[in-house]
């Protein structure tokens, strides 16, 4: 093997990109995280990633409380956005602004971006207004979400 090719192969194998076990989150979820941090600055966005039956991946059963209902509505909102041609909510980026806890979806977003931005904006506002119950974090989904 050519020494130059060997050097390139070694560089790729030990690079941060090749060695990372953490996959980057889809860009839209990064924006949603930032929206949550805008409206609920005193709580980590991770607190919402595994809450109740609907906050996080998937969702089933009856929401356990108002905060979980916010996530159910958000899931349904993404479902509606997916009906727009070539709209993939988890990957669609959009333009928005956060100013002193107020979120605004900016003009210039296409139909998909506008819909996804509004889904995320409304969910982040809902999170800010719903009580957080530590007992509903990381619950047994099989037992409580049927």
From Swiss-Prot:
Protein name as annotated: Acidic phospholipase A2 D
EC number(s) recorded for this UniProt protein: 3.1.1.4
Cellular localization per UniProt: Secreted
SMART domains the record matches: PA2c (SM00085)
PANTHER family, A to Z: PHOSPHOLIPASE A2, PHOSPHOLIPASE A2 FAMILY MEMBER
Pfam families: Phospholip_A2_1 (PF00068)
GO molecular function, one term: toxin activity
Enzymatic class: hydrolase
Cofactor descriptive note: Binds 1 Ca(2+) ion.
Role description: PLA2 catalyzes the calcium-dependent hydrolysis of the 2-acyl groups in 3-sn-phosphoglycerides.
Catalysed reaction, written as an equation: a 1,2-diacyl-sn-glycero-3-phosphocholine + H2O = a 1-acyl-sn-glycero-3-phosphocholine + a fatty acid + H(+)
The species this protein was found in: Naja sputatrix (Malayan spitting cobra)
PROSITE patterns: PA2_ASP (PS00119), PA2_HIS (PS00118)
Coiled coil start-end: none
Binding site for Ca(2+): 54, 56, 58, 75
């Amino acid at each position: 093997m050519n020494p130059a090719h060997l050097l390139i192969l070694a560089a790729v194998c030990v690079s941060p990109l090749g060695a990372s076990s953490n996959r980057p989150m889809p860009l839209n979820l990064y924006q949603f995280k930032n929206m949550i941090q805008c409206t609920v600055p005193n709580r980590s966005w991770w607190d919402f990633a595994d809450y109740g039956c609907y906050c996080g991946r998937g969702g089933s059963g009856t929401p356990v409380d108002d905060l979980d209902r916010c996530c159910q509505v958000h899931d349904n909102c993404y479902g509606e956005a997916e009906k727009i041609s070539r709209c993939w909510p988890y990957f669609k980026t959009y333009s928005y602004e956060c100013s002193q806890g107020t979120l605004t979806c900016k003009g210039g977003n296409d139909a998909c971006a506008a819909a996804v931005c509004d889904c995320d904006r409304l969910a982040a506002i809902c999170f800010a207004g719903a009580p957080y119950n530590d007992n509903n974090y990381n619950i047994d989904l099989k037992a409580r979400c049927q």
